Regions:
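Short solvent-exposed strand-capping/beta-turn motif centered on an Asx-Ser/Thr pair
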Residues: 54-58, 71, 121-123
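Exposed beta-strand and adjacent loop surfaces of beta-rich binding modules
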Residues: 48, 61-65, 125-129
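Short, surface-exposed beta-strand/strand-loop-strand elements in extracellular ectodomains
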Residues: 59-81
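Beta-sandwich interaction modules
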Residues: 93-113
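Short proline/glycine- and polar residue-rich coil/turn motifs
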Residues: 83-94
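Extended extracellular/luminal ectodomain segments enriched in beta-structured repeat modules
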Residues: 42-50, 59
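Buried hydrophobic-core signal for structured, non-transmembrane domains
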Residues: 49-54, 116-118
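C-terminal interaction-tip segments
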Residues: 2-44, 109-136
Length: 136
C-alpha cells in the first residue's frame, strides 16, 4: 500500500477533453453495435468524474448509454440517460444530460488499457465529452 495518496497528475482540460459526436443508432445493451470511444485509461489509469452529453439537433424519445471496456475487450453497461423529445428553436434549447454520481465518488476509474464508450439508441446526433477527468 502506498504511503502517500495518489492524485491525478494531469487534469484533462481544454484541448485534452475527450469528445465524440455520436449519431449511429444502437439499441443494444450488451456492448455490441456501434460504440464511440470517449477516453482510454493512461499508463497509470484515469479517473472520470463527469460525462456530459448534448444533442446537436431535434431529438425523439431514446437513450444514451455509457459502457466501460476492460483490457480483455469485455464491455459492461454502466449507465443510461433517458432522452426526451425536443424540437429546438430560438426559445427551446437542445436536450442535454450528464452522467455523474451524487455520492462524491468518481463516475469510474479506468485502469491502463481500459476505455469508456458511449452510444445512442436513435440515429440522432449527440456530442459526448468526459468534462471532468484526469490521468494518474
Amino acid at each position: 500500500m502506498a504511503t502517500t495518496p495518489n492524485f491525478t497528475a494531469t487534469v484533462n482540460t481544454g484541448a485534452d477533453l475527450s469528445t465524440q459526436r455520436m449519431s449511429a443508432a444502437n439499441t443494444n445493451r450488451d456492448g455490441t453495435g456501434t460504440l464511440y470511444l470517449i477516453c482510454t485509461g493512461g499508463s497509470n489509469g484515469d479517473r472520470v468524474d463527469r460525462v456530459q452529453v448534448k444533442a446537436t439537433s431535434t431529438t425523439t424519445a431514446g437513450v444514451i448509454r455509457l459502457f466501460m471496456r476492460d483490457a480483455s475487450t469485455n464491455y459492461r453497461l454502466i449507465g443510461e440517460l433517458l432522452v426526451t423529445a425536443i424540437t429546438p428553436s430560438a426559445t427551446v434549447k437542445t436536450w442535454e444530460g450528464e452522467f455523474v454520481r451524487t455520492d462524491g465518488q468518481p463516475l469510474c476509474l479506468l485502469k491502463s488499457g481500459w476505455a469508456l464508450f458511449g452510444s445512442t439508441h436513435n440515429a440522432e446526433s449527440f456530442d459526448i465529452v468526459a468534462t471532468v477527468n484526469g490521468t494518474f
